[in-house]
């Protein structure tokens, strides 16, 4: 087998990669983003409270 044939075999035998949805990065981003959006929304809504 030549180098070219080996390269073609490696490309043809590649299986699709399945990535997990919930990774540590996903959890870290959402652990910060969800409360941030909540607090920004609550602070914004407080601006419209009438006495």
From Swiss-Prot:
Keyword NADP: no
Molecular function (Gene Ontology), one example: electron transfer activity
Record's GO cellular component terms: chloroplast thylakoid membrane; photosystem II reaction center
Classification via Pfam families: Cytochrom_B559
Principal place of residence: plastid
Residue ranges crossing the lipid bilayer per the database entry: 26-42
Subcellular location: Plastid, Chloroplast thylakoid membrane
GO BP term (any one): photosynthetic electron transport chain
InterPro entries cross-referenced by the UniProt entry: PSII_cyt_b559_bsu (IPR006241), PSII_cyt_b559_CS (IPR006216), PSII_cyt_b559_N (IPR013081)
Binding site for heme: 30
Cofactor: heme b
Family of the protein in this entry: Belongs to the PsbE/PsbF family.
HAMAP family named in the record: PSII_PsbF
Function description: This b-type cytochrome is tightly associated with the reaction center of photosystem II (PSII). PSII is a light-driven water:plastoquinone oxidoreductase that uses light energy to abstract electrons from H(2)O, generating O(2) and a proton gradient subsequently used for ATP formation. It consists of a core antenna complex that captures photons, and an electron transfer chain that converts photonic excitation into a charge separation.
Subunit structure: Heterodimer of an alpha subunit and a beta subunit. PSII is composed of 1 copy each of membrane proteins PsbA, PsbB, PsbC, PsbD, PsbE, PsbF, PsbH, PsbI, PsbJ, PsbK, PsbL, PsbM, PsbT, PsbY, PsbZ, Psb30/Ycf12, at least 3 peripheral proteins of the oxygen-evolving complex and a large number of cofactors. It forms dimeric complexes.
Descriptive protein name: Cytochrome b559 subunit beta
Gene symbol of the encoding locus: psbF
């Amino acid at each position: 087998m030549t180098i070219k044939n080996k390269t073609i075999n490696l490309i043809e035998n590649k299986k699709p990669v399945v990535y997990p949805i919930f990774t540590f990065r996903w959890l870290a981003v959402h652990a910060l983003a969800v409360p941030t959006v909540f607090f920004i929304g609550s602070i914004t809504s407080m601006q419209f409270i009438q006495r």
